Swiss-Prot record:
Job of this protein: Catalyzes the N-acylation of UDP-3-O-acylglucosamine using 3-hydroxyacyl-ACP as the acyl donor. Is involved in the biosynthesis of lipid A, a phosphorylated glycolipid that anchors the lipopolysaccharide to the outer membrane of the cell.
GO molecular function: N-acyltransferase activity
GO-annotated cellular components: membrane
Gene this protein is translated from: lpxD
Record carries keyword Chaperone: no
The family this protein is said to belong to: Belongs to the transferase hexapeptide repeat family. LpxD subfamily.
Name of protein: UDP-3-O-acylglucosamine N-acyltransferase
Positions of the catalytic residues: H253
Length: 346
């Protein structure tokens, strides 16, 4: 159940209006009734006035019993369904669902064009048009913030940082030594631009290396809560356009992440490694330092990468190997344990 404390339901919406709204990503196969749809719900909870969706075939069995008035399904879906449920076919049903959420819901919390009195903003800082600057925000000298941006409560933006237009920077973020593009979202507690973990060791003493690089973040990037992105020692740390970085990710100094890559929670990338374009790193993946990971690489969850990977490869395990080899290793290990247990019982 969606809480009305936080989200406003914009329904009811006519089914015909929903089809019109999604017209460019669905494939209408019939004339739809002009019925009222009040909400979006999962198949198991939907009522006769709700719409649902199916993107994972594991849940297809619920289409036989769901009470939903309509359901968005994959393009080639042909399984048996409740005869009272209207099917709407989409090339990507999950994407259609994500668009439909915007059609049905809006957050209760809204941001006006306002600078809160408790915000501390340096005289030399430049704040664009139609910005919201929240309570106890600190913006230091020579900062530039683009138009239509939101800087929420308790965030710190250090001297000289440049943030593009349409940014959404949530609470208690700190940003130093960074240039950030347009349409960027940075979630609660993220830390960007701090020193990296760089030391030179001489006679048993670890001497701190002064970091003189910065962090460069492209356009339309999202960075999750409590993620940390270190600035470079000599070469900059770079996050290219369209990247999606989950919560609790550590990105070391001098790392480059290519366009459109996605990194899942608790992954860690050591200094000076380069991740190619449109790569996917699963949860808790570890990438050693000074490696090159080719475009389109996929690393399964908890994979440990210790050597370069050619583009387009899918790997898993630690140390990471081609995914089919990893599956074979897992099967062999299971068989060895089973055999060992049998011998111990004897």
């Amino acid at each position: 159940m969606v809480s009305s404390n936080f989200y406003k339901n914009l329904g009811p919406r006519k089914l015909t209006a929903i089809v019109d709204f999604l017209h460019d990503i669905i494939e209408p196969t019939k004339i739809y009734e002009d019925i009222d749809i009040y909400d979006i719900k999962i198949l198991q909870e939907a009522s006769p006035n709700d719409i649902s969706f199916l993107s994972n075939p594991k849940y297809s069995e619920f289409l036989k019993t769901t009470k939903a008035a309509a359901c968005i399904v994959p393009k080639n879906f042909t399984e048996e369904v409740n005869q009272n449920t209207v099917l709407i076919h989409a090339e990507n049903s999950y994407f259609a669902y994500s668009k439909l959420i915007d059609f049905f819901y809006a957050p209760i919390k809204s941001y006006s064009t306002k600078i809160m009195k408790s915000a501390i903003i340096a005289d030399s800082a430049t704040i664009g048009k139609n910005c919201y600057i929240g309570h106890n925000v600190v913006i230091e000298d020579d900062v530039i913030i683009g138009d239509n941006s939101i800087i929420d409560a308790g965030t710190f933006i250090g001297r000289g940082v440049n943030i593009g237009k349409n940014a959404r920077i949530e609470q208690h973020v700190s940003i130093n030594y960074a240039i950030i593009g347009d349409d960027v979202v940075i979630l609660v507690g993220a830390k960007i631009g701090q020193d990296g973990f760089g030391f030179s060791t001489e006679k048993g003493v670890h001497h701190k290396i002064f970091h003189i690089g910065i962090v460069k973040i492209g356009n339309n990037v999202e960075i999750g809560s409590n993620t940390t992105i270190d600035r470079g020692a000599l070469q900059d740390t770079i996050i290219e356009d369209l990247c999606r970085i989950d919560n609790l990710v550590q990105i070391g100094h001098g790392v480059k992440i290519g366009k459109g890559s996605i990194i899942v929670a608790q992954a860690g990338i050591a200094g000076s490694s380069a991740i190619g374009k449109y790569c996917a790193l699963g949860g808790q993946v570890g990438i050693a330092g000074h490696l090159n990971i080719g475009d389109g690489t996929q690393v399964a969850a908890q994979g440990g990468v210790a050597q370069n990977i050619e583009e387009g490869k899918i790997v898993g395990g630690s140390p990471a190997v081609p995914i089919m080899d990893w599956h074979r290793q897992s099967i062999i290990m299971k068989q060895l344990v089973k055999t060992s247990n049998s011998k111990l019982k004897k």
